[in-house]
Regions:
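Rossmann-like dinucleotide/flavin-binding elements
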Residues: 2-6, 11-40, 49, 165, ...
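N-terminal Rossmann-like dinucleotide/flavin-binding domain of flavoprotein oxidoreductases
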Residues: 51-139, 219-221
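Generic structural signal for helix capping and beta-alpha/helix-loop junctions
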Residues: 42-44, 125, 156, 220
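Glycine-rich beta-alpha-beta "Rossmann" dinucleotide-binding loop(s) and their flanking helix/strand
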Residues: 145, 149-172
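Conserved catalytic-core motifs of eukaryotic protein kinase domains, centered on the activation segment
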Residues: 45-47, 54, 156-160
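Core beta-strand elements of the Rossmann-like FAD/NAD(P) dinucleotide-binding domain
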Residues: 5-7, 134-144
Length: 221
């Protein structure tokens, strides 16, 4: 294997952790390569499109450094036109999920990170250099691999669910519970495990009433 075909660092995943790792690696002159994920219907339904779950979130109120205000001029100067065209117009309420993720991506790219819009299907960690198999075909060899694939929300799979994401349907109470659209409303949490009960308890701070719906006759929590 030639040195030209061997990567120093390959990062799998394009959420906040992936871009932060890429920025650090790029500033350290390691020339990282990020596989940000493929743009496919399967990934869209699973919530694993490029830029991670945060890109599916509207308002982001709990990330330091972005108070409410008009960021339109800053976004115009910080992001290339082709990336700005992929986002909804800035509404002026602070930073949105897609905007925050595009800024993280651009910061990593500015320092020399290379990005491939494809999935990694398999990694052989049995020997170094490691071998990564691309979904589109072909292999990548790397001295180091950072897996930053994050988590996937556990949606119900209802036909109408997709239509109401970020319009009243959420998969994260801590992320969204304090937003105005949920305050002083009757809210429903579906599930009976530890996470469901923790989320329901948290939402009592904001909701007028919280209903916990579980398919069994007793909670697993």
């Amino acid at each position: 294997m030639s040195q030209d075909s061997l990567e120093n660092v390959v990062i799998i995943g394009s959420g906040p952790a992936g871009w932060c790792a890429a920025t650090y690696a790029a500033r350290a002159q390691l020339k990282p390569l990020v596989f940000e994920g493929a743009i496919t219907e399967e990934n869209r339904m699973a919530g694993t499109l490029p830029l991670g779950q945060l890109a599916l979130t509207s308002e982001v109120e709990n990330y330091a450094g972005f108070p409410a205000g008009d960021l339109a001029a800053f976004l115009d100067s910080a992001l290339p036109e082709d990336r700005r065209m992929m986002m909804a117009p800035h509404a002026g309420e602070g930073v949105t999920g897609p905007e925050l993720m595009e800024l993280m991506r651009q910061q990593a790219v500015n320092f020399g990170t290379r990005v491939i819009t494809d999935d990694i299907q398999e990694v052989d960690f049995s020997k170094n250099p490691f071998t990564l198999i691309r979904a589109e075909g072909g292999e990548i060899h790397a001295k180091s691999v950072i897996v930053a694939t994050g988590a996937s929300a556990n949606w119900l799979g209802l036909e109408s669910e997709e239509r109401f994401k970020n319009r009243g349907v959420s998969a994260c109470a801590v992320c969204d519970g304090a937003l105005p659209r949920f305050r002083d409303k009757e809210l429903v949490v579906v599930g009976g495990g530890d996470s469901a009960v923790e989320e329901a308890t948290y939402l009592t701070k904001f909701a007028s009433r919280v209903h916990l719906i579980h398919r069994r006759d007793e909670l697993r929590a």
